């Protein structure tokens, strides 16, 4: 049984020290697509966190009974089932957001973070640790998405969660929105900036030269 200190380390480690996007460079595609608004970034973060946490838990529970030759198929079946449940819940209770997220919720099935944690961690670790690892990696993923979404929505549209923060010129205000920030490639530059900030704060994360 893992102690509280171990669980805390597993939960908080992926947020900064081993962030799946900033350090491992995983899950970048969805970070480009769903961060033009804070609302979609938050919902996508929650969806991935739920899928990663529970797929880790279920895979860990049966890890000793999965034949090595079919382990990837079993992992993908569990992940796909959870993604379907999450997608149906979103369509039932948050239909407008589900439409905005479009296919990207379904693509969680192939997200490198989810598959990577299932194979590299849940297959070798007890259930509680695996569950907390899934939550931690989901929070780390969400932290980057929300950081990128904050800058893109605020400076690209003058709002946060759809609420006007910077009064736009078109509405008689003073702020001219930067439309470039609403284009998916802008997320590349923002993610790069966040990685630079994190690695300035944590120089041990910088790759060795030569």
From Swiss-Prot:
The keyword Repeat does not apply. GO terms for molecular function: oxidoreductase activity, acting on NAD(P)H, quinone or similar compound as acceptor. It comes from the Bacteria. GO terms for biological process: sodium ion transport. It is found in: Cell inner membrane. GO terms for cellular component: plasma membrane. Pfam families: Rnf-Nqr (PF02508). It catalyses: a ubiquinone + n Na(+)(in) + NADH + H(+) = a ubiquinol + n Na(+)(out) + NAD(+). Keywords: Cell inner membrane, Cell membrane, Ion transport, Membrane, NAD, Sodium, Sodium transport, Translocase, Transmembrane, Transmembrane helix, Transport, Ubiquinone. The chain crosses the membrane at residues 14-34, 42-62, 72-92, 96-116, 131-151, 178-198. InterPro entries: NqrD, NqrDE/RnfAE. It is an enzyme of class 7 (translocase). Its EC number is 7.2.1.1. NQR complex catalyzes the reduction of ubiquinone-1 to ubiquinol by two successive reactions, coupled with the transport of Na(+) ions from the cytoplasm to the periplasm. NqrA to NqrE are probably involved in the second step, the conversion of ubisemiquinone to ubiquinol. HAMAP family: NqrD. PANTHER family: ELECTRON TRANSPORT COMPLEX PROTEIN RNFE, NA(+)-TRANSLOCATING NADH-QUINONE REDUCTASE SUBUNIT D. This is Na(+)-translocating NADH-quinone reductase subunit D.
């Amino acid at each position: 049984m893992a102690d509280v200190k171990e669980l805390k380390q597993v939960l908080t480690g992926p947020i900064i020290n081993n962030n799946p996007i900033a350090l491992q460079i995983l899950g970048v595609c969805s970070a480009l697509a769903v961060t033009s608004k804070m609302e979609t970034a938050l919902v996508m973060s929650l969806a991935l966190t739920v899928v990663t946490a529970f797929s880790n838990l279920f895979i860990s529970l049966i890890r000793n009974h999965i034949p090595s030759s079919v382990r990837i198929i079993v992992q993908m079946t569990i992940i796909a089932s959870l993604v379907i449940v999450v997608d149906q819940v979103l369509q039932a209770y948050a239909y407008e957001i589900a439409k905005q997220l479009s296919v990207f919720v379904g693509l969680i099935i192939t997200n490198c973070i989810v598959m990577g944690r299932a194979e590299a961690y849940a297959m070798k670790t007890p259930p509680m640790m695996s569950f907390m690892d899934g939550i931690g990696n989901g929070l780390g993923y969400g932290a980057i998405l929300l950081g990128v979404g904050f800058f893109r929505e605020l400076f690209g549209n003058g709002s946060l969660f759809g609420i006007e923060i910077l009064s736009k010129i078109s509405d008689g205000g003073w702020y001219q929105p930067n439309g470039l920030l609403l284009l998916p490639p802008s997320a590349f530059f923002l993610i790069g900036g966040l990685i630079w900030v994190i690695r300035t704060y944590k120089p041990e994360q910088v790759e060795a030269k030569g």
